[in-house]
């Protein structure tokens, strides 16, 4: 793996508050670490494949799940449901270490693992947010909740509707809006230029016709 990529990923792992949600469970981190040690580099002959596989696994060990929970959802999840996702991760890592796949087929399995973990994680995030954002259901919540930002177990509370199921990435949204307006402005400019050229050509034709008629009259006199 390139040194720069390794340092970048390790800095994400070592930074305070770099872990969250799934990474709050030390057994999940241990399972992912063991999987990485077992597969890389022994099961990848090409350095490029080693780097890609390492990036997938170390990304899962880093702050990705915390950022996903905070930027897309409210960043909290019921601990009993999160435990199920953690067990899923540990079982899947054991399965991958036990098979004989190598190189590209193994890399594809790692990418599939990440996608499946995200899918399961998303389910529990949505499940809690649906209940916590419901004014009637939220008061009935009793199960302990994990704060993904601080890795702290907290008491469930009702969440104001303005914080429910919203995209908390204004910079990305702003950039998207600017990019989406640019093609429309370009199209409008193109239309204006086309209309202006059409009017100009029409005026030239009219002037030419009038000049021709005047010259013809002079010739006939």
From Swiss-Prot:
Compartments reported by the entry: Membrane
Extracellular side: 21-186
Domain of life: Eukaryota
GO cellular component: membrane
Cytoplasmic side: 208-221
Coiled-coil residue spans: none
Positions annotated as glycosylated: 91
TM segment ranges: 187-207
Pfam assignment, any one: IZUMO
Keywords, in A-Z order: Glycoprotein, Membrane, Signal, Transmembrane, Transmembrane helix
Signal peptide (UniProt feature, chain positions): 1-20
Membrane topology reported for the UniProt record: Single-pass type I membrane protein
Claim: Zinc is one of the keywords in the record: no
Comment field (misc): Izumo is the name of a Japanese shrine to marriage.
Family per record: Belongs to the Izumo family.
Name this polypeptide is given: Izumo sperm-egg fusion protein 2
Organism: Homo sapiens (Human)
